[in-house]
């Protein structure tokens, strides 16, 4: 199945703006410029997020603000706002959807860091590292509860149903990841299902619910859902590639951290096709150190695993563009296209 997907990916045209060596900083600026006209509304979202994570309990507030202030691209809120422009855009309504989805994402990060025993997130200590696992778990739970309370301000039964189904799927994705740690026998289907549940669905629903909350036609919000889904799949695959090709400074965590924590990603699945590498990869376990992993990472980079994974990411990105082209032309569509292009080129 890996070969079939790779052949399909390589048969699609490559996305290019004529400058494949775009500087990381310039690329990041292009990403932010794609939605700069929404900066005032993004500020509204930031204030709402800060207010939502605050609690009467100082420790909860401190932990929540610690994660919030670590930064992040806020891709999900941006997708909510841009998708809302396909209907009757009202920031005072749509902000609740944007905050809800970012809070769910943040809660999943806190829980992820406990599961993976991660010390760093975006270059700063994780909540579990700064406090402990119990504080981290309850902070994540508090954020999830806060997100659900926020969503009650939207009187859209369909949106509530979609959101509840998505949360169930996200939880299943987390459970699958725990179950498959250090399992080098898993297949591509398992990996794709896991990244769909852990990443792609939340981005897909960000696009869909933004449109639903603004009263957009069903045809539009369904197309936006699939655009978000394909972008989300591409985004996670790029994330998994960067775990090998980026630097600790850019990642904000050790290179190869996913593999060290036992998470088998697409580059690893391709690398497993190399018999010698497969034997080395199967020896990785919870006792493996960063120093022991470094030569294996270098060997993976020497194979075609990174290139093959990039081809699959680009295949999903092309599918996203195909869905986007069915939507009405305008500023929102142009911005979504620019963001999707950025995702295919991002370096961190």
Curated annotation (Swiss-Prot):
| A Pfam entry, by short name | polyprenyl_synt
Per UniProt, what is one GO molecular function of this protein? transferase activity, transferring alkyl or aryl (other than methyl) groups
Chain positions recorded as Mg(2+) 1 binding sites = 112, 116
Gene Ontology BP, a term: menaquinone biosynthetic process
Which residues take part in binding isopentenyl diphosphate?
73, 76, 105, 122
Q: What is its EC number?
A: 2.5.1.30
UniProt entry tagged with the keyword Transferase: yes
Q: PANTHER family under this entry? A: ALL TRANS-POLYPRENYL-DIPHOSPHATE SYNTHASE PDSS1 (PTHR12001:SF69), GERANYLGERANYL PYROPHOSPHATE SYNTHASE (PTHR12001)
**This protein's name:** Heptaprenyl diphosphate synthase component 2
**Protein source organism:** Bacillus subtilis (strain 168)
């Amino acid at each position: 199945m890996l070969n079939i997907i790779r052949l399909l990916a390589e048969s699609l045209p490559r996305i290019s703006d004529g400058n494949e060596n775009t500087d990381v900083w310039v690329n990041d600026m292009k990403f932010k410029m794609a939605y700069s006209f929404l900066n005032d509304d993004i500020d509204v979202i930031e204030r709402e997020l800060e207010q939502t994570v605050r609690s009467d309990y100082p420790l909860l507030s401190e932990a929540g603000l610690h994660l919030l202030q670590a930064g992040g691209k806020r891709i999900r809120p941006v997708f909510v706002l841009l998708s809302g422009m396909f209907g009757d855009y009202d920031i005072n309504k749509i902000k609740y959807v944007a905050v809800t989805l970012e809070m769910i994402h943040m809660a999943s990060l806190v829980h992820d860091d406990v599961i993976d025993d991660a010390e760093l997130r975006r270059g700063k200590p994780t909540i579990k590292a700064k406090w402990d696992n119990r504080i981290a778990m309850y902070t994540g739970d508090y954020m999830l509860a806060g997100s659900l309370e926020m969503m009650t301000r939207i009187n859209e039964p369909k949106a509530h149903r979609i959101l509840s189904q998505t949360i169930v799927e996200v939880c299943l994705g987390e459970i699958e990841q725990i179950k498959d740690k250090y399992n080098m026998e898993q297949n591509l289907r398992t990996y794709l299902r896991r990244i769909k549940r852990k990443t792609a669905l939340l981005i897909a629903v960000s696009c869909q619910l933004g449109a639903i909350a603004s009263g957009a036609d069903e045809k539009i919000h369904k197309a936006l859902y699939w655009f978000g889904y394909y972008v989300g799949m591409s985004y996670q695959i790029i994330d998994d590639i960067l775990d090998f090709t980026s630097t600790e400074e850019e990642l904000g965590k050790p290179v190869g951290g996913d593999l060290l924590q036992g998470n088998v990603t697409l580059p690893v699945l391709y690398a497993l096709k190399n018999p010698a590498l497969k034997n080395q990869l199967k020896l990785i376990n919870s006792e493996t150190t960063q120093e022991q992993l470094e030569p294996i990472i270098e060997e993976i980079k020497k194979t075609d695993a990174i290139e093959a994974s990039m081809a699959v990411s680009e295949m999903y990105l092309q599918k996203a563009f195909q869905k986007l082209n069915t939507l009405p032309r305008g500023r929102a569509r142009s911005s979504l296209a620019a963001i999707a292009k950025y995702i295919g080129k991002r370096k961190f």
